[in-house]
A protein has these predicted regions:
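A glycine-rich, often tryptophan-bearing local segment used as a flexible ligand/cofactor-contacting loop or short
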Residues: 56-123
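Catalytic beta-strand/loop cores that center a nucleophilic Ser/Cys/Thr
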Residues: 22, 104-151
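Short, Lys/Arg-enriched charge-dense amphipathic segments
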Residues: 32-35, 48-60, 86-89, 101-106, ...
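Short linear motifs at secondary-structure transitions and domain/linker junctions
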Residues: 4-6, 23-27, 52, 87-90, ...
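Helical hinge/lid and interdomain linker segments adjacent to catalytic or ligand-binding clefts
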Residues: 5-84
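Aromatic side chains
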Residues: 28, 46, 93, 134-135
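Short, well-ordered alpha-helix to beta-strand connector turns
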Residues: 45-47, 97, 142
Length: 151
């Protein structure tokens, strides 16, 4: 699922994900219609929803369908604001994700991304990047597996 604010380049994100899925011979469907979230029968055909939607709006029906799919065992993944700043007016969505973007402290600057030891980060190496840092409100019950610090 892609859409929302163009500043996060959701179309570029979906193109990169599409290329990766094709390289792994994985079947996929691309959509930029949030009404698909209201269709539980449609969503139930998938194992994973990869989302890149920033600063958009969900109807109650769309939110209900998405949350029903996720609570039923369908996974959800995404990156950056495409997952953490998708639907500011939907607190049930934010609760399901485990957090919500709040601010970019310091704007664009150089950071080091540090991966903690975890099976999900196995094989990944720390790296430096110049970008905006995300200040998040997050559920204290989730396990943080990567952190950032100014360089």
């Amino acid at each position: 699922m892609w859409g929302g604010w163009e500043g996060h380049q959701p179309e570029l994100f979906v193109e990169q994900v599409k290329n990766w899925l094709e390289s792994e011979a994985i079947d996929y469907v691309i959509s930029n219609d949030l009404n698909d979230y209201a269709n539980f029968e449609f969503l139930s055909k998938f194992n994973l929803i990869i989302q890149s939607v920033t600063m958009s709006q969900l109807t109650n029906e769309q939110e209900f369908g998405l949350l029903k799919a996720i609570s039923g065992g369908i996974g959800i993944a995404g990156a950056h604001g495409g997952l953490a700043d998708s639907f500011r007016n939907k607190t049930n969505y934010q609760f399901m994700i485990g957090g919500q973007w709040v601010e970019h402290p310091g704007k664009i600057k150089k950071f080091k991304v540090n991966f903690l030891e975890d099976e999900l980060t196995e094989g990944l190496e720390d790296f430096e990047i110049e970008t905006e840092q995300y200040y998040m409100h997050y559920d204290p019950n989730i396990e943080i597996i990567a952190t950032t610090k100014s360089v």
